[in-house]
């Protein structure tokens, strides 16, 4: 199943047009409160069933209200499926570990994973990426399709960092196999990816 993971902020959200950086599928000319929306519209078809995993702050009414707004947005974009809410106490020292323990059980064999890291602290981003890496390695037929985050301060952008996450996975594998020149393999992989991109244009 296609699963979309995002963080619900504790603030009032304004609508913006999010510029796609590094991935044409994130292009979306419409204004939206949620930077997740371009992932939904770029990677799914109308009436396609999906699951959204929305991470909220424990006991925060605004964060939970933003989930209800997201549910409406999904319906307005003609997508179907459920929104699963994970409440996490981010004020606690082990909040990111709590997130990991709640997120990992929701990832299953055959999942195609899409992640919007907007509104996430550095530790929360690390926890989510760790969960992705677990799913990719421990489960069957899991793919990390798109990971995006915010761009420069003051700009409304969706910056695709999927290649960086995948490179981290590749380096981990090469390390386990005691490869003598992991940088060379990484360069070759990046060059191959660039050739494929040119072929698509």
Describe each region flagged by the PLM.
Residues 1-112, 127, 133-201:
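Long, low-complexity, Lys/Arg-enriched
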Residues 122:
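Polyanion-engaging groove/track-forming segments
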